[in-house]
């Protein structure tokens, strides 16, 4: 499948060994340089949130607001600016709408177990599921045309003699390719334009789907649990009290909101099947011998819905993440970003996005179901990640 879709085992999600180590180390370094966990990245997210809330203000008091779409544009612009240096606005919105639709088609097609299995045997897929094969092939070409076009445009403008810091991921990677080719030592095999295109694929896919879906699930859960929504608003009114922009400095003073986000991540359990791993040595678990190099799938959902760890796991209860003093408490088993050396590369970015977007959304707006007599369903749309069934809402400004 990798040979068909990627042109080899490339990118960061499905690679291993030295190639994976080099890519992860480089990506983490770039994210740190971009200010991940510091106010540089925070400011970029806040700039996008200002545009997001200004758009929502125009939707206020209308009969219907497509909030999930607003989330997708906001998150998509953050990811795109980090990767390619521009946000989605004006005519670029049509570009985003096209590729987001393409991404959804791809995510949903790959959840079909027959297609997922036959994708490993492309000759069978090509002739047994011709339509699915053509869809995958079309998606592959369109995505890589887009990523390669971004790389080519960056190459035209790249000044390798400039001492300025790179402004986006593609620029940083192209500089690394140049240095690897210049210095030799074997690194030139790890940093190539083909590998860069696949890194863009992994980061764009992962950054888009997970954060946007979590935001959509959070609003869905709160619409269906108005008492939780009321407590979130009460905390925001007590701590913030105005429509000012909420920043990361406010985070420690908003434990109930943080607990609500944690509970949303737990309930959403975005990955129905986690990424494949393999054992690096022989191991025995609960009496079962598993030899080295066995493919395994760690199921985080089994932990997130474990009744011993999370009593009444089907209930939406943010209080489970608070201690008796109302302070946020750490639950070791809560691991929505996975654990270990292959845990989510963008965890810091995702946490920052979720808090800043939701804090400012709930502080500035009241959110209601479009039809109070028919609440949005909890039925999920299957895919590589779970997605809520699309819903619209009504919103009102909280501070006039």
Where are these regions (language model features)?
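Cytochrome P450 heme-binding "Cys pocket" and the immediately downstream C-terminal segment
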Residues: 226-228, 348-384
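Cytochrome P450 heme-thiolate monooxygenase catalytic core
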Residues: 1-4, 18-19, 38-215, 231, ...
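Conserved cytochrome P450 K-helix/beta-meander segment immediately N-terminal to the heme-binding cysteine loop
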Residues: 298-326
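C-terminal helix/juxtamembrane-tail motif
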Residues: 172-175, 294-295, 366, 382-400
């Amino acid at each position: 499948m990798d040979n068909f879709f990627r042109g080899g085992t490339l990118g960061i999600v499905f690679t291993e060994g030295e190639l994976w180590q080099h890519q992860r180390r480089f990506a983490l370094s770039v994210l740190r340089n971009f200010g991940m966990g510091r106010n540089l990245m925070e400011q970029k997210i806040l700039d996008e949130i200002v545009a997001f809330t200004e758009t929502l203000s125009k939707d206020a008091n209308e009969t219907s607001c497509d909030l999930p779409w607003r989330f997708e544009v906001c998150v998509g612009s953050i990811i795109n600016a980090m990767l390619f240096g521009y946000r989605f606005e004006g005519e670029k919105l049509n570009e985003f709408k096209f590729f987001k639709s393409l991404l959804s088609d791809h995510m949903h097609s790959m959840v079909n177990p027959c297609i997922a299995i036959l994708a490993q045997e492309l000759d069978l897929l090509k002739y047994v599921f011709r339509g699915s094969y053509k869809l995958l092939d079309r998606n592959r070409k369109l995505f890589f045309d887009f990523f390669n076009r971004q790389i080519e445009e960056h190459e035209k403008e790249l000044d390798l003699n400039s001492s300025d810091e790179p402004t986006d991921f593609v620029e940083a990677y192209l500089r690394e390719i140049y240095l690897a080719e210049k210095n030799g030592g074997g690194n030139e095999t790890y940093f190539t334009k083909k590998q860069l295109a696949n890194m863009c694929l992994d980061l764009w896919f992962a950054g888009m789907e997970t954060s946007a879906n979590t935001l959509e699930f959070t609003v869905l859960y709160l619409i269906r649990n108005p008492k939780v929504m009321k407590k979130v608003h009460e905390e925001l009114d007590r701590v913030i009290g105005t429509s000012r922009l909420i920043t990361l400095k406010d985070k420690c003073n908003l434990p109930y909101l943080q607990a609500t986000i944690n509970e949303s991540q737990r309930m959403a359990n975005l990955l129905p099947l986690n990424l494949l791993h393999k054992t690096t040595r022989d191991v025995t678990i609960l009496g079962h011998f598993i030899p080295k190099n066995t493919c395994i799938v760690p199921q985080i959902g089994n932990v997130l819905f474990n009744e011993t760890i999370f009593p009444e796991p089907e209930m939406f209860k943010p209080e489970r993440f608070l201690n008796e003093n109302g302070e946020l408490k750490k639950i070791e088993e809560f691991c929505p970003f996975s654990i270990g050396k292959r845990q989510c590369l963008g965890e810091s970015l995702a946490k920052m996005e979720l808090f800043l977007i939701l804090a400012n959304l709930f502080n500035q707006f009241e959110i209601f179901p479009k039809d109070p007599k028919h609440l949005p369903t909890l039925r999920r749309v299957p895919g590589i990640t779970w997605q809520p069934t699309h819903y619209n809402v009504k919103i009102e400004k909280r501070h006039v």
